[in-house]
Structure formats: structure tokens, C-alpha cells
């Protein structure tokens, strides 16, 4: 049976989800690949197709514009770059399938938030102020989508962006969409083993000019995660 692929030699998200966790190695290969610049519009639309969303109407132009914005890396980040965005999109959409996200509107919002949650990330230049980057990324996103969404959706998205501030455990996380995004943001460093987690920690070490070894940075990440924990059963079972 022909599979709908992300790119040559990669099976569809549906195939990966239907064969999970035996198919984890397929997702890992695509998530870790950083030789080729991602085509975000293609990845996002194919993920939406796999979530049974084939018509995005008013969101098509928005997604094209956001895909272009997210393709830039003006601050030369080695962790919060296009490949981090790519991994969060794919893992978020996988979790949406595994945890049975039902609303079509939520599926579209999921892809938009996963793509842009670290939009224009400042990397080592980020101001040491809680929620600074999260609010900046949301502000940059809001310039694009403000006229297309309701106030209710606007504040819902804003809450999710603020919740991605990793050092603080967000309160009252009851939103299925929010749970998916929060788990997807960190799962790439957890679900593929310690060696992969260390590889991402090394990228982050270089980005923020961390003075100590990458394994110390990774252990600090795991310690913080202990106090936060993953939200979805499908996320926990994937590790």
C-alpha cells in the first residue's frame, strides 16, 4: 500500500502512529536529521492531512506566511532552530493521533502553535526575564493571526505559549491541546534515549554558551522535568 510520505524514504505519520512504538526509529531518523532545511508548509499540510484535515481555507495563507518566518534563523541558534520546530510539529501531531485529539479547529491550532512556539527565538541573546521569549514569540505570531481568530482563541494560544516557559510548572493544565504542546516541546530529548538527549543538550550548550559539560545541562533538564512531569499517558509510554 502506498504511504503518504514527508519526503523520500519516510512513511506517513499515520503509518508511524499505527505502528507505534515499533516505528519509533522512523520518527527518530527524521527528527535528528539536520542536513536539509525543512519545508514547513509541506510538513504542516501533510501532518494536517494525516489528521484528516484536507481543507484549511483561511489558514492556508497564514500557514504559508508562518512557514516562511520560521524558516529564518537570524540569531544562528543551534538548538532553537528550524529542526527543533520540525521535531515539535511531528511529535505534537503524533501525540494528537495517539491521544485522539478530536476537534478540527484544535488540530489546526496545534500545528500553528507547534510551528511557532519559539518563533524568532533570541538564543544566547535572550533577556533573562521569566516569560520574555514566550511572550515575544506569541507577539510575533499575533501580528499574523490576530484578525483571523476570536479573542477566546487568542488568549488560549497566549496561555499555551506562556506555559512553555520550562523552569516553571504551569498551573491548571486541563486543555488537551496545551498538554500535547508541552509534552511535544521536550519529548525529543526523552523518547529516543540518553544518547539522543545528550546530542540535543550539546546543541543547547553551544547556543547558550553554557560553560560546563553538556551532560550537566542534560541532568539539570531531567531534574527540572521531575518536578513538572509529562501530561499525556501516550507521552509517558513513549519514553
Task: Kindly give the residue locations of the regions a language model identified.
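Short, surface-exposed helix-loop/turn micro-motifs enriched in polar/charged residues
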Residues: 80, 102-111, 129, 149-153
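Divalent metal-dependent phosphate-bond-processing catalytic cores, especially two-metal-ion Mg2+/Mn2+ enzymes
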Residues: 2-44, 78-86, 91-104, 116, ...
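Short alpha-helical scaffolding segments that buttress acidic/His motifs in well-ordered protein cores
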Residues: 62-70, 110-116, 157-165, 180-184
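Histidine- and acidic-residue-rich, metal-dependent catalytic cores
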Residues: 85, 92, 109-110, 133-171, ...
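Metal-dependent catalytic cores of enzymes that make or break cyclic nucleotides
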Residues: 125-131
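Short alpha-helical hairpin
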Residues: 38-72
